[in-house]
Amino acid sequence: MKNINPMKTHAWKKLQNHFFDVKNIYIKDFFCLDKNRFANFSVFFKDFMLIDFSKNRISSQTLKLLFQLAQECYLDDAIKNMFLGKIINKTENRPVLHVALRNRLNNKIILNNIDIMNEIQIELKKIKCFSESIIDGSWKGFTGKSISDVVNIGIGGSYLGPYMITEALKIYKNHLNIHYISNIDGTEISEVLKKINLETTIFLIASKSFSTDETISNANYLKKWCILKTNYKKYFSKHFFALCENIKTAINFGIKYENIFKFWDWVGGRYSLWSSSGLSIVLSIGFKNFESLLYGAYLMDQHFLHTKISKNIPIILALISIWYTNFFNTETEAIFPYDKYLHVLPEYLQQSYMESNGKSIDRNGKLVTWNTCPIIWGSTGTNGQHSFFQLLHQGTTMVPCDFIIPAISHNLINDHHKKLLSNFLAQTASLAFGNINKDIMNMNLKYSSENFIFSHKTYFGNKPSNSIFLKKITPISLGSLIALYEHKIFVQGVILNIFSFDQWGVELGKTVANNIYNNLFKKKKINVYDCSTIGLINLYKYWNRI
């Protein structure tokens, strides 16, 4: 990829001038100027998704300049390089090929003179055979009973992706109970162990390196606990499986080779749900539905790769986000799925965005002088309306939002979904248009009890949002939605000249934590850290009588 400072492009300078021309224009004015704004500022994807970006503080000229910015940053070349398997993760010297995992036409993808699609197909067949044997009951535990429960042990991408998908597609769930242990917190393990029968439970240890401290600490405890409780040394070989790249370490841990489902170093952790790391997804919804999930992502991949920039959904949404973070200086973006099945989506996207683009060093190794990644947060609607929407409507901070809803609900109870949709539409309209006209906004009303109350009930509007309208939540539509966000994040990283596929920012905390951990066992008082950390460590020891 080209290492271009975006602020030095011609488009960026034009955008700065353009910003001063449009910053005081209200969204309602854009609609008045263009009676076809909805049609002109929305894109259909296949027959199951519509992205409406008309309620943004942008004009056609804004988009034109943003497209020019993308071209000056050689975005098209970067996209092609990712799909071709070029090394774009420079700090780890790796290609980035999660798109290969959902290459449903099985086109050749050559890496180091090897067609990696052959390896992917072999692993998919293994996943298919294993998952079907668990689901149909032919796989037996150590006492000859079929499996009823699956425990996925993993953190970060080895947890958030699979958990988000299994929740989102719960309507497709079979009889198996899926549990997740992610945190290194004894409470989490204890609560899961209360729910399972060891005779009918399998454990999936999901860690790319098979060395993640939280995951391996939890796996070690469960390994010893299960053998102790069952008094059967062979329990481990019948009930424990590894999802990893580091096969040697998994074998040394005690996992049988045939119980290892592998993925590769060119699959980033937060993109690993498409790989064997998503085995818990397959066990929850079945292999055919998992294939549909992959197909949905593949459809978005093809759209991203082949669609012209003016109709390319991930590119458009990425550029609008850059417009807000760097010209309006917004600091957060919110994700609001109006469907309970998508309740984990904001947390999942929080990791996807912030671990990918939460960087302050550019691809030239220099400190950036522009904004990179907003803070991502969100909640399901309508719960959020009764929590923090007050700030969105009347606060001093502008928060660009994505609203997501299916037109067809899986659970038709009375007129609930119509009411849910009404709230969805009301929020996007109210945020955009408010409830008063510009003349009243600019008036200095004389004090009266009536005016006093009126001022507190005003909604100025002009708060931007995107509406993502799904026909229905299915494996295909969900796959497309997740891939859309993946590519949006990639586009932002390319244009903002940062590396989106590493996460060095998490390493320092791990190193310091290991050092502190070793000192927690020493009886003498600690004085090798700052006074705050020392005080907290010594109080911990006092309360625990160490």
UniProtKB/Swiss-Prot annotation:
Transmembrane segment boundaries: none
InterPro entries linked to this entry: G6P_Isomerase, G6P_Isomerase_C, Phosphoglucose_isomerase_CS, SIS_dom_sf, SIS_PGI_1, SIS_PGI_2
Catalytic activity, reaction form: alpha-D-glucose 6-phosphate = beta-D-fructose 6-phosphate
A Pfam family matched in the record: PGI
Entry's Gene Ontology BP terms: gluconeogenesis; glucose 6-phosphate metabolic process; glycolytic process
SUPFAM superfamilies linked: SIS domain
Localisation per UniProt entry: Cytoplasm
A GO cellular component entry from the record: cytosol
EC top class, as a word: isomerase
Catalytic activity, EC: 5.3.1.9
Keyword Cytoplasm: yes
GO molecular function: carbohydrate derivative binding; glucose-6-phosphate isomerase activity; monosaccharide binding
Active site residues according to the UniProt entry: 355, 386, 510
Superkingdom, taxonomy of origin: Bacteria
PANTHER family tied to this protein: GLUCOSE-6-PHOSPHATE ISOMERASE
Protein family membership: Belongs to the GPI family.
Name assigned to this protein: Glucose-6-phosphate isomerase
Source species of the chain: Buchnera aphidicola subsp. Cinara cedri (strain Cc)
Lineage: Bacteria, Pseudomonadati, Pseudomonadota, Gammaproteobacteria, Enterobacterales
